[in-house]
Amino acid sequence: MAQKRPACTLKPECVQQLLVCSQEAKKSAYCPYSHFPVGAALLTQEGRIFKGCNIENACYPLGICAERTAIQKAVSEGYKDFRAIAIASDMQDDFISPCGACRQVMREFGTNWPVYMTKPDGTYIVMTVQELLPSSFGPEDLQKTQ
């Protein structure tokens, strides 16, 4: 299947704002166990930005990633159409990449929207949700019958 470019192409100033917001969100991370703060900034179709950070728990499986925090905040306020998400960490040498669970949650809300994966110096790479999670299972698959 041919890959499509993101349905939403953001203006450079919008990308920059999203990157800054993801860095700001990282400052709120609660990560006393991993010491690995992550921030995310999610842009809705309406232009709102929802920030999220990772929140760990002594019962490790109960922690939540920054991306899912941002998405859950947006959905809980009635937003379900997303234009882009930016993710930030303190990794100097590598771009932060969403985990598999976050990729699946992002996919719930579409495949053709951009994910900006950053470094602290402001550089980034961008991929669509489809590129991050090819051949994925989504809501429309539940409607298929044999």
Swiss-Prot record:
GO molecular-function terms, A-Z: cytidine deaminase activity; identical protein binding; nucleoside binding; protein homodimerization activity; zinc ion binding
EC number: 3.5.4.5
The keyword Transmembrane belongs to this UniProt entry's keyword annotation: no
SUPFAM superfamilies on file: Cytidine deaminase-like
Binding site residues for Zn(2+): 65, 99, 102
Known cofactor(s): Zn(2+)
Biological role: This enzyme scavenges exogenous and endogenous cytidine and 2'-deoxycytidine for UMP synthesis.
Protein name: Cytidine deaminase
Species, as recorded: Homo sapiens
